[in-house]
Swiss-Prot record:
The lineage of its organism: Bacteria, Bacillati, Bacillota, Bacilli, Bacillales. Belongs to the UPF0354 family. It holds the Pfam family DUF1444. It comes from Listeria monocytogenes serotype 4a (strain HCC23). InterPro entries: DUF1444. Coiled coil: none annotated. This is UPF0354 protein LMHCC_0955.
Length: 266
């Protein structure tokens, strides 16, 4: 099989994503491909897609195409908040994530940690659309009502855990791919339940949207494994959040920086 290059991947993505009213713009300086449709834009980092392709083959490209198509579909979808509060969920994003749409609409958010911010989304089935502040007046709902509905719905989501162990350190993974895996970090009842179960230090990570990692850390090896694991997930995620894990103590999440086999407290 011929080696996949950045230009070959660019051409393939343009071919597979080609559609009426859709434009492409390639930035040679940082090797990104912007896809625009009806004023909505998605920017793809081609070297990352090539790296994923080398590991996963065509499945990596299919995943990107699906992500873009569903994103445009969500942007075009109608949002009726008033009678559909069961479709509202909180989602976690990096603090650097844009707080406005391309059209300048302010997104509904809440503060979370120094590394993360809470946004609110309206579930559309296979995708979701971020809730804008302007939608609340039309729906005659308050920020508080949206928040309460979102966290109530989050509490009803199942949390299946997969467990792995490395040298006495246990790691639990939430990977349902329902779009809200990282959001489980906001389920305080679940965090308290895990804290009671864990015998070491409880360290969590949300490197990207589709994974939550919980570590029962007993020693420096555990911190080292978690640090490498988090960086790997962060690099592979379609929607990266943060490469910094969080220590959970007394009901609070505190970001920490882990280097090599040492844990450095913030």
């Amino acid at each position: 099989m011929a080696k996949m290059t950045i230009l070959k991947m660019k051409a393939r993505l343009e071919k597979e994503l080609d559609a009426p009213n859709r434009q492409f713009a390639y930035n040679r300086d940082n090797d990104t491909l912007s896809v625009t449709q009806n004023g909505k834009k998605v920017t793809l980092t081609i070297p990352q897609i090539v790296a994923n392709y080398e590991n996963d083959g065509d499945a990596a490209v299919e995943k990107i195409v699906y992500y873009v198509e569903e994103g445009f579909r969500a942007a075009a979808g109608n949002v009726e908040l008033k009678n559909n509060q069961a479709n509202i969920y909180p989602v976690v994003r990096a603090t650097s994530f844009p707080s406005k749409t391309k059209a300048g609409e302010v997104l509904l958010t809440d503060e979370h940690t120094a590394e993360t911010k809470i946004f609110y989304a309206f579930d559309l089935g296979k995708s979701y659309r971020f809730i804008e502040e302007g939608m609340l007046e039309k729906a005659q709902l308050t920020h508080k009502e949206i928040r309460e509905a979102a966290f109530r719905n989050l509490a009803n989501l199942a949390i299946p855990l997969k467990k792995d162990a490395v040298n006495g350190n246990d790691f639990y993974f939430v990977r349902t791919n329902d779009g809200y895996d990282a959001s489980r970090l906001l389920n305080e009842a679940f965090l308290r339940e895990m804290r009671e179960k864990i015998t070491g230090e409880m360290v969590l990570a949300v490197p990207h949207q589709d994974v939550l990692i919980i570590g029962d850390i007993q020693d420096n090896t555990g911190y080292d494994v978690l640090a490498h694991m988090t960086m790997d997930f962060f690099a592979d995620g379609l929607v990266p959040i943060t490469s910094l894990p969080f220590v959970y103590n007394n009901g609070k999440l505190e970001p920490i920086f882990i280097m090599a086999k040492n844990r450095l407290k913030e």
